[in-house]
Amino acid sequence: MAIIISYEKNGKTIYVQKGILCDISLLDKPRIWVDFNGPWTDLYFLSQVDIIRDSNGNEIELTENMEISIFDLDENNNSDNLLADGIVILNDTGEYPSVKWLVKIIPNNKYGKFYWVSDTKK
């Protein structure tokens, strides 16, 4: 379940979906956490709100067609996390109305659709 936090900035309430912080040594670069176990084959739930935090805690404001780098934790708690790249899209599927943003996976030219952190170090 996503955790939403809020704070005041310039007189406006800003809502941020907390991501999963991850030791940068376990990733190749800052990435946004996504659960790769979803109901579709190339779309995954991304966020309920417009701002999400990456693995380093940086706030990322989501926009349509924005390219992002994502990860999911290894299901066996190994340090070799699963990686992917994608494009942010609005959820216009008519399903799961509480989810505003989805990510569409774009295969990486070098590694394919999904790849491991260890692949980036070869």
Region annotations inferred by a language model:
Residues 79-92:
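Short beta-strand-centered aromatic/proline hotspots
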